[in-house]
A protein has these predicted regions:
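Membrane-interfacial terminal anchoring regions of lipid-handling membrane enzymes
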Residues: 1-351
């Protein structure tokens, strides 16, 4: 019989959590126009008895609260969120984070620290699953994968390792322990696509030498309407059906599922066209419009992933995007890092 160590399973009672939920839901309703898609009925899956690990690519700090509101307002339980401890500093903020169901993932600097962090994450994930607590994680571990390399980062396998172990051992866990819930575990891939990334300039290190990492509290100064956000929850993957796979194979599989959920928005098309035009030394609008048509044509096999297109006419599309994002109004080579950021979000479709 496996006896779990007594752990502090984060509680959601009290003023702090209720206030955080209220503010998050208010921002979700008033500072975005969210479009949510479910490829399967997650509410029904929860009712049938399951514990879920939500995983997806990390683009913006908005996801750490916005995804929770998307689930909460669709009558799904709010998951515990994993967040790098480099984003929250100070005893007060750490306490507030824990009271709002955030668990901190240590960002190790040395090899030893990284190994210890992985062990702690694995142990926490195992306990959350055993206590029936849904979790939301970003296995990339950073928002700077795209701005630094032009590609989405790989998924760290540690959290998936915990789920594999849980599924193999769950029937041997002492169920007499208070709060233990032995449920079927699922991994739910998700993706969040933005018509405007609120911290885009900071992510690409605009007017600086390299990208810088924003602290979570810096996001308060970025309170702005980010317009259309497209959230997609993919088909849940039942972990017990993949026990023959290694944790790395699971990580690769889930990453591929997340890539397939990426939507193509007008801003991505215009950005890709601008990047190609400016890299070829062409900044006249006629060349840019022609390139927009070319990009749309090359994406024809993925039209089922187009979202937010009211008009495919290049000039109309460019005007719509430039009204939302100032850097697009007067295309110039010095703004290429911004254009490339939005273009690279759909780069895997253009290969």
């Amino acid at each position: 019989m496996k006896v779990l160590p007594k752990r502090q399973i984060l509680k959601r009672r009290g003023f702090t959590f209720l206030l955080a939920r209220l503010i998050s839901n208010w921002g979700y309703k008033n500072l975005t126009k969210a479009h949510v898609e479910f490829e399967e009925d997650l509410l029904d899956l929860k009712k049938r008895g399951s514990v879920l690990l939500y995983t997806g690519f990390h683009r913006s700090l908005w996801e750490t609260t916005g995804m929770l509101s998307a689930l909460n307002l669709n009558k799904l339980p709010i998951p515990i969120v994993g967040m790098g401890d480099n984003l929250i500093k100070g005893k007060l903020f750490v306490t507030l984070a824990k009271n709002t169901s955030i668990f901190l993932v240590k960002r190790g600097k040395t090899r030893r620290e990284i190994v210890e962090s992985a062990k702690e994450l694995r142990s926490n994930m195992y306990s959350f699953m055993a206590y029936g607590r849904d979790v939301l994680l970003f296995p990339e571990g950073t928002r700077t994968g795209i701005p630094r390399t032009g590609e989405y980062g790989g998924f760290f396998p540690t959290s998936f390792d915990a789920l594999l172990e849980f599924e193999k051992e769950k029937n041997s866990i002492d169920q007499n322990m208070k709060g233990i819930k032995i449920l079927d575990s699922y991994i739910v891939p998700f993706n969040c696509d933005y018509s405007m990334i609120r911290e885009a300039s900071e992510l690409v290190g605009f007017n600086s030498e390299k990208p810088r990492t924003l602290k979570v509290w810096d996001s308060l100064k970025m309170l702005k309407n980010i317009k259309d956000v497209f959230i997609t929850f993919g088909k849940p993957v039942k972990v017990s059906e993949h026990l023959e796979k290694s944790r790395k194979e699971i990580a690769v599989m889930i990453r591929e599922h997340c890539l397939d959920l990426v939507k193509i928005l007008p801003v991505n098309v215009v950005a890709f066209a601008l990047t190609e035009s400016l890299n070829n030394g062409k900044s006249d609008m006629a060349s840019i419009y022609k390139n927009i048509e070319s990009v749309i044509s090359r994406l024809n096999d993925f039209r089922d992933r187009f979202r937010g297109f009211k008009d495919f006419e290049p000039e109309t599309m460019f005007i719509t995007v430039s009204k939302s994002i100032p850097e697009f109004r007067k295309p110039s080579a010095d703004k290429l890092p911004i254009y490339k950021l939005y273009a690279d979000y759909i780069g895997h479709y253009m290969k």
